[in-house]
Amino acid sequence: MTDTADAVVVGGGAMGASIAYHLAAAGAGRVVLLEREAALGTGSTGRCAGGFRIQFSSEINVRLSLASVALIRGFEAEHGLPLDLDVDGYLFLVRDDASWPGYRAAAATQRSLGARVEELDAAAAEALIPGLNVDGVVGATFGPDDGIADPSGLTNGYATLARRAGAQIRLGTAATRIWTSPDGGRVTGVSTPDGDIDAPVVVNAAGVWATALAATCGVELPIHPEPRHVVTTSGFPGRPERRTLVIDTATMFYFHREGAGVLMGMPRLADAVATFETVVDDRWVAEELLPQAVRVLPAIEDAGLARSWVGLYEMTPDRHAILGPVDGLAGLYLANGFSGHGFQHAPIVGKITAELVTGAPPTVDVSSLRLERFARGELIGESHVV
């Protein structure tokens, strides 16, 4: 059986749901969103920490964040749908004299583009988060407009809006192939287990599975999965009252208040090897993550572990997303490789993707993020990957 659509979006995380909504709302015709699992947001979206921030080191990420954070913070007022969020900021702690100038330069870039970012000394950082170990801290940056939002709420909110705008969402339906014209110059649709869908526009928002899908139409994406552990604790005396997300830049250990306890995580050296494995390494949690947690917030020593899980980042060589059309393959649009910040950029990327598809001027110029930058050697670089 062959179906038809004007645009097919592959991937039902926050990114795909946002793209589907914005396409439908922009009048892109019949929009179909395909999600391989039985529910939306069960991949990287459902396993992320939910943070959103303006504090990045590259100008393009700051511009995207400024626009996306505004959409997140205004979501409930604009759409009339509930979204649980806390705007208590992000705090980056720097304990290395050699690294501090780079963080100050990043803060200057952020402020030059309109962000509110403060530079704090150790005492001010401890005053913000009482109980924080600031021994050796040479400086900190604090973004008061950064915060934490509910990933499920945002994803399902955009899905609700997409349906209201006329989009169709098909759960339990994987896109197994992207088809192209005989001359290979444009996409013509996708295959699913239920049959083909003919469509002149296909948006690949398949997260860590995007590389395999793109390969079916001859497009090579330089993306690999990188597992990240997340752990939550029970309540404990001295738990911070603010829901500020605190990052110790020496190891990129982070935590924020979550319920009665905290949610925390940290990159693991072994995870630099590309793998789709999502099994929790309990020994690493006990021997590496927890000692680091106690070093940063000593009161955590009295907490018990509640839950732990592993999610996957979709990493690119320059730790920036791959966005936009593909040279030589009309109708294919990419929204991939967000390197850990896909959830927070989903609102604005959905809007920009719809603008690119419909020919409207993009809210943010993302031409520097096109796939072709890798072949040209025009990598960007981002130091603030948590």
Feature annotation, model-predicted:
Residues R63-L66, L93-G102, T141-T160, R170, ...:
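Short beta-strand to alpha-helix junction loop
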Residues A49-L128, M252-Y254, Q292-A293:
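Dinucleotide-binding Rossmann-like beta1-alpha1 core, especially the glycine-rich loop
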Residues E220, G235-G331:
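Active-site lid/adjacent beta-loop-alpha segment flanking the redox-cofactor pocket in flavoenzymes
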Residues P291-V386:
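C-terminal catalytic lobe of FAD-dependent flavoproteins
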Residues T141-P200:
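Helical element adjacent to the flavin cofactor pocket in flavoenzyme catalytic cores
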Residues A24-T45:
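Glycine-rich FAD pyrophosphate-binding loop
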Residues G41, G195-R242:
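Central helical "cap/lid" subdomain
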Residues T2-M15, V32:
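Beta1/beta-strand and adjacent pyrophosphate-binding region of the FAD-binding site
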